[in-house]
From Swiss-Prot:
Keyword Metal-binding: yes
Ranges for domain 4Fe-4S ferredoxin-type: 301-331, 350-379
Protein's GO biological process: lactate metabolic process
Keyword field: 4Fe-4S, Electron transport, Iron, Iron-sulfur, Metal-binding, Repeat, Transport
Annotated positions binding [4Fe-4S] cluster 2: C320, C363, C366
Function noted in UniProt: Is involved in L-lactate degradation and allows cells to grow with lactate as the sole carbon source. Has probably a role as an electron transporter during oxidation of L-lactate.
Gene3D superfamilies: Alpha-helical ferredoxin, NagB/RpiA/CoA transferase-like
Gene: lutB1
Protein name: Lactate utilization protein B 1
GO terms of molecular function: 4 iron, 4 sulfur cluster binding; metal ion binding
Family stated for the protein in its record: Belongs to the LutB/YkgF family.
Superkingdom of the organism of origin: Bacteria
Binding site for [4Fe-4S] cluster 1: C310, C313, C316, C370
Amino acid sequence: MGMKIGNDPFHKRTATGIGDQFMRQAVRKAQDGLRVKKLKATESLGNWEEWRALGEEIRKHTLENLDYYLYELSENIEKNGGFVYFAKTAEDAREYVKEIVKKKNAKKIVKSKSMVTEEISLNEAIEEAGAEVLETDLAEFILQVNDHDPPSHIVVPCLHKDKEHICEIFKTKLNYTGTSDPTEMARFVRSYLRDDFFAADIGVTGCNFAVAESGSISIVANEGNARLTTTLPKTLITVMGMERIVPTWEELDVLVTLLCRSSVGQKLTSYITGLTEPGGTDGPEEFHLVIVDNGRSDIVGTEFQSVLQCIRCAACINVCPVYRHIGGHAYGSIYPGPIGAVLTPLLGGYDEYKDLPYASSLCGACTEACPVKIPLHDLLIKHRSRIVEEKQSPVAWNVAMKGFEKAVKSPRLFSFAAKSAPYALKPLAKGDKIERGIGPLKAWTDARDFPVPKKQPFREWFEKHVKENDDGHSKS
């Protein structure tokens, strides 16, 4: 799949999202529900801000010493009998996994939920190597069955589907004969996948956090699929972004506490799976850890480094007013919402994603929601500044801003423009509102009321008001 979703331009994707009434209703319901659950879950911790500060401190320290902890992690995994591969690019990661698949002559691979494997198009690479890949996370399974529908949310990938849609997908694709009851459908999927876990040659997982001091990986989940994926196949491949690491189990405890409460409003998820070494009675015989860079090292040491503090909880997405209206697919990336608007241009470049930093009201709700205090709205502003500096913004926009700059720098020109505006805009007005804008203004007036400027400019009114007050004081 890769990081990119679709080929439509941003304005078309947003129009599609805004026009999808079911999706908008589903997002509103999910956001409202998750926000309430998170509030209740965080209240039980006491001072939530102290926990956030601790989470930020842990993530900052880890990133500032990332080379040290990655070295410690790799050394300990190899001591434990595992193999570590540092993949500079997505292509490097794909080729390494393909070689394992070919070497093992693997025909069936089970896979638990992983955003980084989506980012590097790992499923397609495995299929090229001649093996079948089965997504075993329920939401990811639904999307895969539905002709590889892309995810719309980091934690709830099929947020844009309801139970009736899912039931219809199962009936069409899997000959399901049951009802749309979620429990019944979940049982059907469990039964459908059960034999595949036992028949799988290789298991592939993501990694919420790797623990450097012990060479362990941890997976946080609410379904048993991740645990089955890590224990039943003889070979396990875990793929992680290079930043998904903690120094010790003590720090892991803090971050898991923040993650569970921030993502789905739980004190703890149903399963927290830890794997330290292969060869145990309930684990794989062979373990490979693929540590993916894919542009992350270019972010380290820059003004955007704090985005790598992200623990993929989606708390920012769950409060974002823009995501609420346009949905996840409108971002054109597997990473939607505020975190996606910051991260995606850094990994994918401005040529493809220069619109995303503008998909924000800059309200700051995302920053307040983030459990590790990433200053997301500040980073979006930094993106916008860089886009302008690199002349990535549209020509029409640059011309308009140059004209505006000249107008506000010249008192005479500014005064003329302010006095002329009511008359220039009169043909577009109905009453005291502008009904239809011209060019870029059209998108604004189609959805919002735009008042006609007053005939008396504010500066003129203010000068007159001050003079009248001064005269009144002098007479008294």
